[in-house]
Amino acid sequence: QSEYYGSAPAAGLVDVRIGTDVGAGPFENYLLEQEFYESAMNGLQWIIDHKDDAWPGVDEEWFGIDIISLSWGITSHEDGGSDGSDMHSRILDEAMQAGVVVSNAAGNSGEDNDGLSGMSASSLSITVASTDDQNTVNRTDDTIAGYSSRGPRKDNGDGNPVNELIPEISAPGSNIVQAEGCVSSGGCNNFLGGDASQNSYTGRGSGTSYATPAVSGVVALVIEANSNLTPLQIKEVLKHTSELRGEPSAPDVDPYWNREFGYGMVDALKAVELAIFLRESGQTESIDHTLQSHGLNFSQSEIINITGHAWGQAGPVERVEFRIDGGEWKDATYSDTPSEIGALTPFLW
């Protein structure tokens, strides 16, 4: 116990080794090809294989593995970085499809990076950028951290530009108080034997590796609020409830994504509130990550006016419906006929 709490203090942890046989030493990433990291693949595959395990000695509510929090990157050794087809990206995609939410670090190569690594280029996982809170509690002055890797991801040529819009979410990752193991300092030495009784929270660190577990904790809260959400639906919940920052970097593809902040700064309260609403209203199954609809304006006098825009990421949208205070679902009116509008083309409703 300590005075410091993360975003999901009651979550359970399952430690899984993904380092190489000799650990993960300094500059190792720059010398070794991604294919060398078979142990990382083995660790991730182990999680997928054991995601439903009944762990001994714990209650049923603690069974299985729900989230992968991955604060590790590997130099891609490819011009322009990974396009998401490397082995690490593919296994993270596999984990998402298997029902395990993946939150992974975007990397710390800054604005002029040479692309994203295999641990940051997955098409399906939640890739996290890092913000700098300027040492204040006011979110209005938060900026993207200078070291945080920018997107987009290298084009994989599949004709769908949406999956290049990485990172997706940003979270605090600068000057973060961290757990620090007592190894050898002053009278404290537990390098060989001993226990963790003298470990502390005396260190501070910065990086997307710190932003990632913050988002992982928010994911845990969302799962607790609505356990019926799939990993891709959870990703949509985070995207739709995040606080937008920056101008759109690819407005022809998505008018909300920014190459620094993704779809915005994570908002735990709004994400949990939306998850609860979807559960209580019975609308969880209605969340489709290929369909986008966003409200633009709301006004109320004698008549309620709601406007927004919508689009499909993979094909046309058939219609947009709305209801007020749980009333009857009604069709919106449109600027154009939705079914005649192709993918990635927003229309007003």
Functional labels for PLM-detected ranges:
Residues Q1-E38, D59-D66, Q97, A121-S125, ...:
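Subtilisin-like serine protease catalytic core
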Residues G73-T75, V101, G107-E111, D133, ...:
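Catalytic metal-binding/acid-base residues of hydrolase active sites
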Residues G84-V102:
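Catalytic-core regions built around general acid/base machinery
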Residues N108-L124:
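Glycine-rich, charge-decorated loop segments at or immediately adjacent to ligand/cofactor-binding or catalytic sites
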Residues S120-A220, E224, F261, K270:
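Extracellular S/T/G-rich loop segment that most often corresponds to the catalytic His/Ser-adjacent loop
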Residues Q283-W349:
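Long, low-complexity serine/threonine/glycine- and acidic-rich segments characteristic of extracellular
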